[in-house]
From Swiss-Prot:
Name of the featured protein: Small ribosomal subunit protein eS6
Gene encoding the protein: RpS6
Localization (cell): Cytoplasm; Nucleus, Nucleolus
Gene3D superfamilies: 1.20.5.2650
Record's subunit section: Component of the small ribosomal subunit. Part of the small subunit (SSU) processome, composed of more than 70 proteins and the RNA chaperone small nucleolar RNA (snoRNA) U3.
Length: 349
């Protein structure tokens, strides 16, 4: 079994191949993340403490933390799971992984040195591997070197040496620092703020102009409405005046009619009074003549009364005769009449 040992303090790592099963027996039945002493590997490893980071079996399937078995398992994995890198967004895949328990079927075991022992391990603890890539962001560089805002971050960038060429000076390459505050950045910021300020001012001016136009339009609308109301009032008042004039004319006409009627009544009264006076005067003149006529008329009236009585008697006599006469003729009389008619007809023939 291969033991891949890493030492984070120096950044170095080294692989050791151990064939003795007695030395490897101490790793069996241990889980990932468990810490174990390395004294059983030899005297040079005395005092070292390892942490099991993972491993691969003989077919190359990786160990997965949380799978409590020493065999393979097929799991549906997605983004964020270990032992799987999705090729598409949202992709899931069923993969074969090995459990987190160590046994003899592993081909490689990854170990991390948690505690250094008494002796140095050649190629692991005595050599330091420089970081090829340092922090790129300005705030992370300040955090790494504990810098303040006044310090220049560009001097602390981790540079990478380029391969040397014959007859030329050695060259290094440094990454571009992100979020670095420079005069150009400040100038751009000032420019953005100025544009924003101008935009705000232009918006305020446009709003003021709009409000001015709006007030003007509202004022015009109010004036138009007032003029319309006044014209309607004038039209109503003119209509009312015409109606009042018509009413006055009608009242004048009615008064004239009443005056005419009263005048006619007075004239009638006067004429009637005059007629009555004339009639009284005429009566006063006629009364002596009537007295003379009355004596003559008395004899005439007596004769006239006798004539009337005779007429009444004559009228009463035929009425009584009519009452006494029968309504129907007797049958014998009828027969005689019919016989007489027949004789007349025969004579004519």
């Amino acid at each position: 079994m291969k033991l891949n040992v890493s030492f984070p303090a120096t950044g170095a790592q080294k692989t050791f191949e151990v064939m003795d099963d007695h030395k490897l027996r101490h790793f069996y039945d241990k889980r990932m993340g468990a810490e174990i002493t390395a004294d059983h590997l030899g005297d040079e490893w005395k005092g070292y403490v390892f942490k099991i980071a993972g491993g691969n079996d003989k077919q190359g399937f990786p160990m997965k933390q949380g799978v409590l078995t020493n065999t393979r398992v097929r799991l549906l994995l997605k983004k964020g799971h270990s032992c799987y890198r999705p090729r598409r967004t949202g992709e899931r895949k069923r993969k074969s992984v090995r459990g987190c328990i160590v046994d003899q079927n592993l081909s490689a075991l990854a170990l991390i040195v948690v505690k250094k022992g008494e002796k140095d391990i050649p190629g692991l603890t005595d050599t330091t591997v420089l970081r090829r890539l340092g922090p790129k962001r300005a705030s992370n560089i300040r955090k790494l070197y504990n810098l303040t805002k006044e310090d220049d971050v560009r001097q602390y960038v981790v540079k990478r040496p380029l391969p040397e060429k014959d007859g030329k000076k050695p060259r290094t390459k440094a990454p571009k620092i992100q979020r670095l505050i420079t005069p150009v950045v400040l100038q751009r910021k000032r420019h953005r703020l100025a544009i924003k300020k101008r935009r705000v001012e232009s918006r305020k001016e446009a709003e003021a102009e709009y409000m001015k136009i709006l007030h003007l339009r509202r004022r015009q609308e109010r004036i138009r409405r007032r003029s319309r109301l006044s014209s309607m009032r004038d039209s109503r008042s003119s209509i009312g005046e015409e109606r009042d004039k018509e009413k006055e004319k009608a009242a004048v006409k009615a008064a004239k009619k009443v005056a005419k009627k009263e005048a006619k009544k007075e004239v009638k009264k006067v004429t009637e009074a005059a007629k009555k006076a004339d009639a009284k005067a005429a009566k006063a003149k006629v009364e002596p003549k009537k007295a003379d006529k009355k004596s003559a008329d008395s004899g005439k009236k007596a004769t006239a009364g006798d004539k009337k009585e005779k007429k009444v008697e004559k009228k009463a006599a035929p009425a009584a005769a009519k009452k006494e006469a029968p309504k129907r003729k007797p049958e014998a009389a009828k027969g005689d009449a019919s016989a007489a008619k027949k004789e007349k007809k025969q004579k004519k023939k």
